[in-house]
């Protein structure tokens, strides 16, 4: 069951741009709720409450819709037979040493990435934290505004641009289009 719990951990990390590690591993069963759109009661949003983040005392990210509909129910039902309480951990509910767990899950991610030849890329390595970078990049490619991405990820727009999106060729092309767009060359 440890590997299924690891899968859940990796999926939660990628669901809302979390900082992988203790912010996610310390989520309790009471730290999530479903929000409903007042205009469309069928539109559900999964909101987490994270206490004591790196940058502020409380952060409330929301998960992507696919995760909310398809993956989160699996996570909630994974330990359904156990008598879990609201104060129990959402992920790995029976393991108490969260720092050791963070290291073990991170090592597993690296080992799997190396085995699949995904760990080394563009002259660097891709540890578990790269899931956060990928989250920002994918949202940006889909047209999300940098300010919105930063809000979701509990970071600054400057950090999103300089660290998470990186200076890839395509990002520079997109930046050029936004800045210089329809400028005409004067001959």
Summary of predicted features, one role per range:
Residues 22, 103, 158:
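Key DNA-contact positions within bacterial/archaeal DNA-binding proteins
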Residues 52-77, 86-111:
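C-terminal catalytic core of Y-nucleophile DNA break-rejoin enzymes
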Residues 35-37, 95, 178-187:
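C-terminal secondary-structure termini that scaffold catalytic or DNA-interacting sites
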Residues 81-89, 106-151, 158:
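Short, basic (Lys/Arg/His-rich) helix/loop patches that form interaction surfaces
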Residues 13, 25, 150:
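The alpha-helix within a helix-turn-helix
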């Amino acid at each position: 069951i440890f590997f299924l719990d690891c899968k859940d951990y990796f999926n939660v990390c990628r669901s809302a741009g979390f900082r992988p590690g203790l912010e996610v591993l310390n989520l309790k069963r009471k730290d999530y709720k479903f929000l409903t759109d007042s205009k469309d009661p069928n539109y559900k949003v999964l909101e987490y409450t994270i206490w004591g983040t790196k940058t502020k005392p409380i952060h409330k990210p929301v998960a992507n819709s696919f995760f909310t509909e398809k993956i989160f129910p699996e996570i909630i039902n994974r330990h359904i037979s156990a008598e879990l309480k609201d104060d129990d951990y959402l992920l790995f509910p029976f393991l108490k040493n969260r720092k050791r767990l963070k290291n073990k899950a991170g090592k597993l991610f690296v080992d799997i990435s190396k085995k699949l030849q995904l760990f080394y890329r563009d002259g660097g390595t891709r540890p578990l934290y790269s899931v956060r970078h990928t989250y920002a990049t994918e949202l940006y490619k889909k047209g999300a505004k940098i300010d919105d991405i930063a809000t979701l990820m509990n970071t600054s727009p400057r950090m999103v641009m300089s660290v998470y999106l990186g200076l890839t060729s395509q990002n520079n092309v997109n930046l050029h289009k936004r800045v210089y767009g329809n400028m005409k060359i004067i001959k």
